[in-house]
């Protein structure tokens, strides 16, 4: 059926900020969908609150609204734009839930707006646990014994009836939010209560656990003519019981017999047809490893995280096809863009193995609960492609950018047998390394299977790699063993370690004997049809399929997996760098390992290499492509860390030189530059021993800021207020050494700001200064920021501009850089300089209209700022005021302290823009899901040193009609100052009392918590327990008084003053 001509304008709802469970995959799918709709001639209106995405670029849709994803806000845009239809199935769970909420308000019926793609009834049937169970039973498809409940009492009664373990699955949530496995009555009571609160329809499915079954996923497409096809079958390494987003996943399935595959395939197609889904959908199934029995787990009636993985694993662009199906086209009339000759109805065939491994945030949160279950905890993922499961898995481990570079973990090596068995039985994010360690200690496949329930085939893959380690170690410099090792994915670094050599020695031996990788094409059809996809992976098997073109080429290094401190913002910069290179006539080549992102869409660059971002893999691509050079400024710390090694091997680093990159990051060299330019910076000392750090802190006087050098996202950075706290910090971060010094800085309390600048060596352009709303001490990634600045004088802005220019020229910056300042008493202090793109690039690019990554790329390639039409100094400021607000995922991570400090904790961001600061703040808070009633109850739990500062804030809350709740000390202080305060008892005072602080939170009496009790790092401290309870109960929480002040500004703007005349 040809595309529809009765609709002209389509609204696409984006997925909002990145949180655990909903990461960059929706930027990728949303971007694809918008471009596909525009290709077909439709006018596209996009609504999304996330400025960090390619999707919210003005080139992606005809109209782009970066506005809060709330019913009010989206309804206002609908009334302004009058779209003919809305496409909600590409914005993750947020997009789906928004469509359902809009339908309930009646606006869609009132304005005759149609929902494209899967119909509302189908979405409800798939998402509503009870309706879905009834459908499966009607179709004769098996589901685990289960019951939908709306109260904790019903959950407990059903638990007693069917026995434990039990899985709780809240309705209409994503990433397993609020769910979990319960082994007893108490666990079920707690998880069911939490799940009911987090479900938008207060409903949970309680089902008998089938943990231990194989978990299989099918990515399925269907059109309105009932053509349906399987894009990809994926098999989880981990059995059922661990959320698929936290599981290692292989594609194609590795252990299914043809009979099992056809049985599960038929079930998936039967489900998508019965649900009448139009577009892409993900079917999750559980297969008994010992029989042909299976159960249907769930269907996601939308494009999902797995769809992004399936698209990259097969080369089949699911979101693009889903968008075309939504406008009435059928699979037999849509061309497959990979082959250009076959149609979209052909099921992809794979002649390689893909392995996905999740990337977890526990390097940032060492005290978090790391046990994996049905609630997702990973922030991102990596994917690798090889000819064998071993090769794909090894390459995926190398892509993770964690301490472990292969299957050997020093921590696992030190563990006792008991500890290893514990780790195998209760899976954590690092279980793979403990599996390998168990095999090194002689555990049999049967022993390990008994402990883990992981399929024997996958265990054999891990065991084979451990056996290969022994063979490599026993045969140093043996060429046959080297060939075999490379075939199974062992890196030069690992082989060098086993041979007690340097990686360069292994590389030289390899190259001298012609043991070099070939690059194979990902073509969706296992080479059955002619294909010209510029999408490659390396292997040591077969012929090379990547041919060097005659054009001059430049390699852009991506930023790897999404993690805290290095998010989708860096992918945004990578993609824009590619665009600039293409406009200048270069062949733009991307190397990256992240399946969720736009940069790994093969249609974005001229050539895509899906490879680990290690020195070895990047050098191998350089050896083949012989580029003009490599750009490292846009891939975050990942690419910067590769610069020195690449240069050492003769690869040209374009833009700022390696020597100058080092001068910015090396503390002593940087101090010299600051001194020579007569600039201010907080006094700081460097120490390489425990005693040295203690002495430095005494010399500077507390509080001090302590951190390791060379870090991203403020990792292991803390403000320390006493000797005891410093001792604890050093105990937690014991790896101080000559080459790992600790920096100790005088902590300056002032206004912090961020500047992104572009320099060509003569001219320095400052697109804008972003003022942080929180005082110094909160990491810039966790601070709210406003542009243009609201409290800086012209004189201060001039000083900031002057210092930026001096530093850019002194550091010989060529390209982009980021500087952070503290402004105190009119003086400007330099905190740090990052000689690369920062996470504020997308935000600032969108509000100033200066495509910073593109401008910087042109500078890197030799085009001056003047030639591009830019003048020296600060760019003119727009009339609109824009606020960037961080978004956190604390509800997904138990035991992570939500107190904000110099270590970054946010996973995403939103933006609010308007003509006044208060309105921009209101939109930013709304986008970050911090919408408060016009009057309500605020709980204040405040450090003694903050008591004076809280007084004006408390008075302002009282003036707009808020009731104030506080514990004894704060309450007495506020009462003395003529404020009416409701007294609550402390956490450990009378735990049964109705007015105990935790019971007040549990009973839903509190609308907002302001808690500044942050410097006790213990998990049983009052401050920590109150914060945890606020997060569990979904109560907005602030830990910085500046944020409370900003929130008040937005609330006051909505309220009317009621002041007596007398």
From Swiss-Prot:
Q: Where does Mn(2+) 2 bind?
A: 298, 300
Q: In which pathway does it act?
A: Amino-acid biosynthesis; L-arginine biosynthesis; carbamoyl phosphate from bicarbonate: step 1/1; Pyrimidine metabolism; UMP biosynthesis via de novo pathway; (S)-dihydroorotate from bicarbonate: step 1/3
* Domain spans labelled ATP-grasp: 133-327, 671-861
Residues that coordinate or bind ATP 1 = 129, 169, 175-176, 208, 210, 215, 241-243, 284, 298
Please indicate which superkingdom the organism of origin belongs to. Answer: Bacteria
Oligomerization domain: annotated segments: 402-546
Q: What Pfam families does the entry give?
A: CPSase_L_D2, CPSase_L_D3, MGS
Binding of Mn(2+) 3, residues: 820, 832
Q: Which residues bind ATP 2?
A: 707, 746, 748, 752, 777-780, 820, 832
- How are cofactors bound according to the entry's free-text note? Binds 4 Mg(2+) or Mn(2+) ions per subunit.
What GO terms describe the biological role, i.e. biological process, of this protein?
Answer: 'de novo' UMP biosynthetic process; glutamine metabolic process; L-arginine biosynthetic process
Any one GO cellular component localisation term in the record: cytoplasm
Annotated region described as Carbamoyl phosphate synthetic domain, given as residue ranges: 547-929
- Could you say which residues bind Mn(2+) 1 here? 284, 298
Catalytic activity entry: hydrogencarbonate + L-glutamine + 2 ATP + H2O = carbamoyl phosphate + L-glutamate + 2 ADP + phosphate + 2 H(+)
CDD domains xref list: MGS_CPS_II
The EC designation for this entry is: 6.3.4.16, 6.3.5.5
Q: Which residues take part in binding Mg(2+) 2?
A: 298, 300
Function comment: Large subunit of the glutamine-dependent carbamoyl phosphate synthetase (CPSase). CPSase catalyzes the formation of carbamoyl phosphate from the ammonia moiety of glutamine, carbonate, and phosphate donated by ATP, constituting the first step of 2 biosynthetic pathways, one leading to arginine and/or urea and the other to pyrimidine nucleotides.
Q: How does it assemble?
A: Composed of two chains; the small (or glutamine) chain promotes the hydrolysis of glutamine to ammonia, which is used by the large (or ammonia) chain to synthesize carbamoyl phosphate. Tetramer of heterodimers (alpha,beta)4.
Q: In its UniProt entry, what is this protein called? A: Carbamoyl phosphate synthase large chain
**Species this chain originates from:** Lactobacillus helveticus (strain DPC 4571)
